[in-house]
Amino acid sequence: MASDRGPSVLVTGASSGIGAATADLLASRGFQVFGTSRNPERATQRAPHIAWLAMDVRDDASVREGVKRALDRSGRLDALVCNAGYGIFGSIEEVPLSTAREQFETNWFGTLRVLREAMPALRSAPSARIAIVGSLAGRAPIPFQAHYSASKAALDSLALALHNELFATRVRVSLIEPGDIRTAFNDATDFDLVRDSHYGERAARSRQVIERSLARAPGPEIVARAILRALTTRNPRIRYTVGREARLVSFAKRWLPERLGLRLIRRHFGV
């Protein structure tokens, strides 16, 4: 993945949070970074050292044009970081189906669109890497965040299937699985989607636990460092579980009976 200009990488959702920290770190390590944003002008003001591309991962034409522009400017693509996403809060019963579809349109189908457009260039590279940013919630679903958790579980399956599909090629795939991370992503989560919920205090307690956990969580730089390792290590891991809490939960999921694991989740979130 070496060249005079350094390897080229496309990072989706690069204007804030994990994406911004990743784009900054990769640029500092010599990567030619193409960052996507729905508002590239504002993103350029924050980080002029990144080559910004307008892209809405929900739109086929926008994704196609964004990937094309990156290839036109660099001539190749050595790595892809699929990071664009957001969260919603509310019960399975009360979140409108249209809102649930929108969650998957960004988190799941958005990732799929970018992968499909970038794959031919990645397969043509001498050695290429893909990092898909999932979440611990994909393996330990959060009460009243079922839609977000399910979208991340879908990315978990996507990353593992893609790893096997590309195993005979020169492309390596890693799933990045962070726990709670303190970013602007959390501010963008719609906690007031469902007002006057039938679940009352239980939903309120779950929200309070989430907000307290996020307030004391590590910053996005810890995830950016894991992504850097996935893109530069000779034999990258299939899964990078990021953060002490995430590693503990991953261990518990592996060894505890499922019923006990669900009970611990209920106790933690006060539901």
Where are these regions (language model features)?
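Residue(s) in the substrate-gating loop at a strand-loop-helix junction
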Residues: 135
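Rossmann-fold cofactor-recognition segment
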Residues: 47-61
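Substrate-binding pocket helix/loop in short-chain dehydrogenase/reductase
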Residues: 91-92, 96-101
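Active-site loop immediately N-terminal to the catalytic Tyr-X3-Lys motif
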Residues: 93, 140-146
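Conserved glycine-rich cofactor-binding loop
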Residues: 15-16
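Active-site helix of classical SDR
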Residues: 115, 151-154
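C-terminal beta-strand-loop-alpha-helix "lid" module of Rossmann-like NAD(P)-dependent dehydrogenases
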Residues: 165-214
